[in-house]
Amino acid sequence: MIVLFRQWLWRGLLLAACLPCLAMAASIQALNYSSREVDYIAVENPGNTNSGGGGDSIRPYGQGGSICCFSVPEKWHADLKVVVVYQLSPDPTFHRETVSIPPYPDGKGGDIWLIVYEDGSVGAVVSLYGPSRPEWPGKIKGYPVPTKEYRDERRKDKLKREKNTLDFLEKRLQRDFYTLSDEKIKEEKEIIEFQKKIVQSLEGNVR
């Protein structure tokens, strides 16, 4: 009886010791809180470059898609780390950063979220909940939102492109005017007028 009890106790201790090692499949999500394009972002286990998953690209202040799969422990432990592999445009360099995973919210495993911050640093969390939930363990709460400065720069860039298009259309009509039919000239003028409205609308939004 004592021998059986010792065997049962030993098995229980072994099982308890292995609990942190039990793994679960996790989808890979990515968030970009920066104004730079993320050309590539993926995740690996430390010391094992063949354990990677991901490879998404993300626009500035954007979110990547859900990519399968990566393995994470069912239970969080204090030395849990992953390696984030990433490339930020226009720099062609691939960076590898080992980051610590904070405690799982509610003690539950979930997707692994790779995060790029405004200063170019990276992080990762494992969470069953998204960034808009109060349980979200990330440093920044909520999904990425473009800054006013970034939105203004995008408008200026778009205005410049639309002005270049208008200039091209006007010069093309001037160049080909005497070779076009009346119907084609009318059509070209309508296109130019429409393009002018686009430019005027953008000029009203750019300060």
Language model features with spans:
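Bacterial N-terminal signal peptides that target proteins for export
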Residues: I2-L13
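Gram-negative bacterial Sec-dependent N-terminal signal peptides
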Residues: L13-L19
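Beta-strand-rich domain onsets/edges
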Residues: L19-A26
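General secretory precursor processing signal
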Residues: C21, Y33, S71-V72
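Intrinsically disordered, low-complexity segments enriched in small/polar residues
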Residues: A26, H77, Q87-R207
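Structural motif
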Residues: I28-R36
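Short N-terminal binding/cap micro-motifs at the start of the first secondary-structure element
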Residues: V38-Y40
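Tryptophan-paired
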Residues: V43-P92
